[in-house]
Amino acid sequence: MTLPFSWITNDVSQCIDLTQDEHICSLSPVTDTEENMSAFKKSLFGKYDCSLNSEDQCLIVENGSSNFVTSKEAQKEAMKADSDICPPQQMAFNLFNETVVQKDMLNKEKFSHSASSNISNKDDAQYGIVTPVTEIPKQFRTVFKEFPYFNYIQSKALEHLLYSDRNFVLCAPTGSGKTVIFELAIIRLLMQVPMPWTNVKIVYMAPIKALCGQRYDDWKAKFGPVGLNCKELTGDTEMDDLFEIQHAHIIMTTPEKWDSMTRKWKDNTLVQLVRLFLIDEVHILKEENRGATLEVVVSRMKTIYSLSHLSEDRKAFIPMRFVAVSATIPNVEDIADWLSDENSPGVCMKMDESSRPVKLRKVVLGFPCSTKQSEFKFDLTLNYKIANIIQTYSDGRPTLVFCSTRKGVQQAASILTKDAKFVMSIEHKQRLQKCANSIKDSKLRDVLQYGVGYHHAGVDISDRKVIENSFLIGDLPVLFTTSTLAMGVNLPAHLVIVKSTMHYVSGMFQEYSETDILQMIGRAGRPQFDSTATAVIMTRLSTKEKYVHMLDGADTIESSLHKHLVEHLNAEIALHTITDVKVALEWIRSTFLYIRALKNPAYYGFSEGLDKIGIEAKLQELCLKNLNDLSSLGLIKMDEEINFKPTETGKLMALYYIAFNTAKLFHTIRGTETLAELVSLISSCSEFSDVQLRANERRVLNTLNKDKNRVTIRYPMEGKIKTKEMKVNCLIQAHLGCILVQDFSLTQDISKIFRHGTRLAKCLSEFLALQENKFSAFLNALILTKCFKSKLWENSSHISKQLEKIGVTLANAMVNAGLTTFKKIEDTNARELELIVNRHPPFGNQIKESVAHLPKYEIKFQQLAKYRATTAEVVLTVLLTNFKQLQKKRTAPDSHFVMLVIGDDDNQAIFKQKIMDSSLFKTGSWTRKIEIKRASKSTNVCLNLISSEYVGLDIQQSFNICYLGSDSFNADLVTQHKSENIFSQEIYKTSTKTKDIADTNWSMRQTAIKCATRECNHNCKNKDACGHECCKVGVSEKAEMKTNFYSYLNDLRTRNSVSSATPVKRLKMQMEAETRNVNLQNFVFTPKPSIRSPCLKIPENILLQAESSVLTNKYKASHQEETCCKYEIKGCGEKQTKGMPKKTCERRNLTDSDKCNSSSSENAAYVTFDLGNDIWDDFDDDNLLDASNISSLTDQHTSEFTDVSFSKNQPVSKSSLSAGHHEEARYNAMSINKDSYRYLNAKSEVFSQENTQCIDVVPSNQKLHGKMFSENTIKHMFTLQEETNYPVTSKMDSPHNGCWSSNIFFKTPENKTQERGCYHQEDETNAFIGIFNGIF
């Protein structure tokens, strides 16, 4: 018996009943060969129109030809592919003509265009026919490779999805395989469009990002081999990456993101390419925020489709199709009516719980709760009842418990471990112990050993992965989690418990939404393991009936668009979708609000009993009220005929997706707000309403706000953190100040805050740019926008954090090393950078290269010689100094630009210009002539060049404009150029009060003062009008004393620049506070008075004469110290005349601090820890041991050093060797004989002290040649020794004579054996061992 269809002529919808008689079917594998592919099945893949002629036959139209097929013939054709499948007793294929349905609908007075299929027969659902995967074309079967047959719900929907293009809505319980419904619709579209499918796009929309991410991973693996590209477009996606969507076939997005994007794509053809729109969890229409957004987005897509298909070729045109799935709801027909249009009525299919693959048992438990008991205490009492519920309903299988808060998750897990144990065996315990050893969280590790775990967003990612894997494989019997897991991670369980139906949102407790409840209980049932599952909801006795009603699917879905109509009306007006009241009403008719207002007007505040005309009048009145609100803020313009035009402000609000309350907040700006006030204003925006202030976060936030022992935020707030606005403000400042926040939940909040904050700050800056009299606030808004994008304050020292591969840790290391500007980083040696950040080469070269390829700007400001009393003409020039270097490589993105802003003391924005880097790459400059009007307060103008993304590239200059009759007509222009880290103080703030004006002028003067100047100490009342030049330009500051470490780094750079290899030895410098002010005078050697030797008989008068001669020569030498020149061993070339001694003073190897100290102690011994550049080149340690073999030096260069008399064993100082010319006169003036031997000893002592301060440096690339001694000198010295028979040991050999300069190396003789015979045995005991100057 063939089941007839019937038209239901009520004013709800038309229903097509496709329920079938009970039948049993056996399944066997099916092969899809060419022979088995019947003509009937082939006809289903083409476009067709069908009309029902009689009960027993239907008309099939294919390619213009018609064939009549009886129901029995159709049945045979359908089952011809597999003879093993038992057909039903009677089966009818009812294919309906869409035009006939349309005519019938127009003839009847009703508001519905949809057809509904009610499938509720339990026996039919259990034993009905299921379709094999081979029903679809072979090239797409890999999408369903995980199963050979579609389930009953999928099989029933396949006929409408695969063989027609009508809009489709499925209402089925959770866990019934609704994802396959979308995949069948995708395959239908691919069958219609030839490869490579470049002109079609598919949009999948889900309420949350977690579902989009799951679907992206799933479909990328399934449809990737077929040839489709998938792209995820959510709130985490950067706006600069949207060009990738142009090459994507399937786009996963959320309603909010798609709404924001389509507001920008009015003229873009990308939206017009969308041919399939998939809506998951469509029952979120009842949610207040997401529901309104989803409703507007679908209505907008319908409008775009209706406008675009008019210009398309009707033969090749593919209509836009909507496919939506929903949980069990009673009024799913209303959704189908909403998605339908006059030409394509939608199909609605309803499935009951009996068709669920895993049967779900739903239990609602009510617990008593007094009115005095808080929600926190009630939630705590439920923790002690969980053990009994698990024991009753779990059957020893995995259990998932949902809690409202993170703290509640941990508390419930801890209590359960005390009440029950879930370890089954020793092996089970060992596996749990192994998992616990890999857990970082100590509390989680403790409970995991008892078979209980917890999972929420605050848990470390690695710990979450371990917990998820343990639960999936069955090692973890009980898992506690928050409700966010129900939306994000797919962890099915046999038993699901919802502990309390209240959760803490926006500072108050609220009931879970129906979507949240359905998602949580939808986790019950594992198709691969279970045939049944259980869901338990724990709630109050007072709300028990509510959730029983909800689980039965009796809650009607209502629209929430009327609560947010004002923002969406503004968006549609900005897109020119709505131009007048008549068009606005037409747009309202395309919404779900209109469908439900006709059926339930009382819910929307309309009177009962209104007809269609009355309801439309009420909707028109609602539109006019919201349009007046938009007009009052200047977001739209309305004329007398009630035509609408968007304003620039209204376009900004629509473009940046700004709430209406936020727009009202922006209109309260006075124009003199500081940076701190703008941060506070943005923190109060409605976009942060979902940020929660948790009790366990207050301590961390208060520490960030005020703490004496730690780094705090830049602008501390008064009192403690008590509101969510204060929390947002604190987190913004902490992140901009590079203050580490270790709390994971706060880190997630920061990510959300900066995502919204960047958008809000950009909108605020463009909003203030439209107003000429708010220069100060506009400039601070530009700076704040850059701060949000770079995540740094505008005066931050952590500018290196903006470079690639440098995070907070490495940026802190560079700040500690003094690298706080891009210029300092660029001037630092690459190897030194690697030492600072502890990285291997070529990391330093990469950092320097990145900085070198950043844009470098300069500004030139020239006033033309056309002086007037009220106006002045100036020429502005912006130079890109390294534009040739940037032709090859650029660090900044192509979208980088600078904003040129000029303002005066009247807070007027004189000039604004956006300059793209791409325009500067051509010629390297940008020039513009502008006219400046004279301000009433002063003639100063402030010029600012603000980078769009980088901190450290901004330029600020202040100019004094000359006008006729001005006091400063002939004054010099005061300029300031800052190439890094400008704006150390706030942009000046103006006010009407005299005191505020004075503060403004002071701030402007601060801008004019250069970096190396300070404000003078004059107490002038008006420093702009006084006669002191220092009041306007400042007073130069003294240069700071450079530290020992700075000198050490400079010396390290110098040595590194000339050294080809790393030094073999290094002398570590001791960084102590005391070493900076060491008085080297304390280390001067004071010789003891000479004692006459009994062996020498020298007359007293000779000694007195000798001592007097020494003092005389010492005085002459000190008198000419100021005019002495510096000599190198290579030679100065000039000889002293008239026997006047000349003292050499070489200080090239001294550090800055040593130079300062040495100047104060002229006669003190100089001690340095600096090895110098000359120490390491051509140096041989082995040859130093033969320092006594100096005879080989006596035969060379005898002409330059003549008549210099030394004791043979007397150590020769470096100064005496290198400055031989002027010391020669001193020694030739003395006659050395037998009686003056002691005189020579005394003179040597004084001489060694005298020449300690004056040393020469041996160049690192030269070897010291032995040209120190003349033959006469050596001969005279040996003769003197033989005549006196005095021991060769001299007093200068004493180790106490450390004042001798020893910064010299002796060249080892080439033939040591030959030279060694020229020495006495005593010579070997007097070896010169000194190596480093000043050490011994």
Curated annotation (Swiss-Prot):
List each copy of the SEC63 domain by range. Answer: 646-961
State its cofactor: Zn(2+)
Q: Which domain of life is it from?
A: Eukaryota
Binding-site residues for ATP, renumbered to this chain: A172, P173, T174, G175, S176, G177, K178, T179
Record Pfam families: DEAD, Helicase_C, Sec63, SNRNP200_wHTH
Q: How is the cofactor bound?
A: Might have a zinc-finger.
Zn finger (C4-type) ranges are 1016-1031
> Coiled-coil regions in this chain?
none
Motif span (DEAH box)? 280-283
Q: What does this protein do?
A: Required for crossover formation and complete synapsis of homologous chromosomes during meiosis.
Q: What's the name of the protein?
A: Probable ATP-dependent DNA helicase HFM1
* Annotated organism of origin: Xenopus tropicalis
Gene that this polypeptide is encoded by: hfm1
